[in-house]
A protein has these predicted regions:
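Helical segment within the ABC ATPase nucleotide-binding domain
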Residues: 72-84
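Conserved ABC ATPase signature
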Residues: 32-36
Length: 146
């Protein structure tokens, strides 16, 4: 309710209920955040971030604390957001978790962007995102585009 009021949302209740059901939080509707486990708090934060139907959304380590079912569901959400035209930015150390989802990645090294990698430029390159990350961070020059 707080998020809906903060964003002055109208007709949000069905979407709110769908988000809570999608992330298995329906039975937790009456609980306060501090009564939830870390994983449930993470899922609730994701639901709160999605409620205003943003055109751009930033997720910081979104899979930390989530159970495998919730991770699978969150990946579906990422795909749906992308397909709807929403820009999805994900900051993560769990590189393999984003392997099938990324279009553009910014690889950081010592607090700076070391490389910008476009998936479409790698069609003939069979390296994984993790391989590319280690190739760039283990000795490559800063600020190059792949």
């Amino acid at each position: 309710e707080f998020i809906a009021r903060a964003y002055k949302l109208k007709d949000y209740k069905a979407y709110k209920d769908a988000l809570l059901e999608r992330f298995d939080l329906t039975d937790k509707k009456k609980k306060f955040g501090d009564e939830l486990s870390k994983g449930m708090q993470q899922k609730l934060s994701i639901c709160c971030g999605l409620l205003p139907r943003p055109r751009l959304v930033l997720f910081d380590e979104p899979m930390i604390g989530l159970d495998p079912h919730a991770i699978k569901e969150l990946k579906k959400v990422f795909e749906e957001l992308r397909d709807s035209g929403c820009m999805v930015l994900v900051s993560t150390h769990m590189i393999d978790s984003m392997e099938e989802l990324w279009d553009t990645t910014y690889i950081m090294k010592q607090g700076r962007v070391a490389a910008v990698v476009e998936r479409e430029n790698l069609k003939d390159n069979h390296k994984s995102l993790e391989d590319i990350f280690f190739e760039i961070t283990e000795g490559a020059a800063l600020e190059r585009e792949v």
